[in-house]
């Protein structure tokens, strides 16, 4: 794969990622949706992906390592979005109990409780508060992370032969 092609692919992915970040902040601040712990973890994964894409635009020598890291972070984001989709599919009597906001969790609860909420979700993660074309927000996030994981894997195998 040529350097120019690699940079074009990474630039395209970075543009998509910036749009995802803008959409998440728009939905939070303009629409008024409060992100649940799993949403916050997905957002962290998106920011890490953007950082890795920015890093990859600066150097091409370690492109296969950066691409592998992109794949792993995208898989982590895919886990969080699929976990949230699973929580949303549960009947209301089987969904976990709602917890206070993350700021209250961090201030008053032990770190184990905060980590459990961030990695496993809480009752507010099971609520479907927004849909587009019948697909909830974690469904769209899962599609984004799946695309990024596929592209990361593709770039990993293709960048070992950069000229």
From Swiss-Prot:
| Recorded topology in the membrane | Multi-pass membrane protein
Question: Which ranges does the record list as Periplasmic topological domains?
Answer: 27-44, 83-139
A Pfam family that the UniProt record links to this protein: DsbB
What's the domain of life for this entry? Bacteria
Provide any one GO MF term from the record.
Answer: electron transfer activity
Which Cys pairs are S-S linked? 36-39, 98-125
Q: Which GO terms describe its biological process?
A: protein folding
Q: Where does it localize?
A: Cell inner membrane
Please tell me whether the keyword Nuclease is annotated for this protein: no
Which InterPro entries has this protein been placed in?
A: DiS_bond_form_DsbB/BdbC, Disulphide_bond_form_DsbB, DsbB, DsbB-like_sf
List where the protein spans the membrane.
10-26, 45-58, 65-82, 140-158
GO cellular component, as recorded: plasma membrane
Family classification: Belongs to the DsbB family.
Write down what this protein is called.
Disulfide bond formation protein B
* Protein's gene: dsbB
């Amino acid at each position: 794969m040529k350097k120019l092609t690699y940079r074009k692919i990474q630039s395209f992915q970075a543009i998509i990622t910036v749009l995802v970040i803008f959409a998440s902040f728009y939905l939070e601040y303009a629409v008024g949706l409060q992100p649940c712990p799993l949403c916050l973890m997905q957002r962290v994964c998106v920011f890490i992906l953007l950082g890795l894409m920015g890093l990859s635009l600066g150097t091409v020598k370690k492109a296969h390592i950066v691409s592998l890291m992109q794949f792993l972070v995208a898989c982590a984001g895919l886990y969080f979005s699929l976990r949230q989709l699973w929580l949303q599919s549960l009947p209301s009597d089987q969904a976990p109990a709602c917890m206070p906001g993350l700021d209250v969790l961090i201030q008053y609860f032990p770190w184990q409780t905060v980590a459990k909420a961030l990695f496993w979700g809480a009752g507010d993660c099971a609520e479907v508060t927004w849909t587009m074309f019948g697909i909830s927000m974690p469904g769209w996030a899962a599609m984004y992370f799946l695309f990024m994981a596929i592209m990361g894997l593709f770039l990993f195998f293709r960048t070992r032969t950069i000229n």
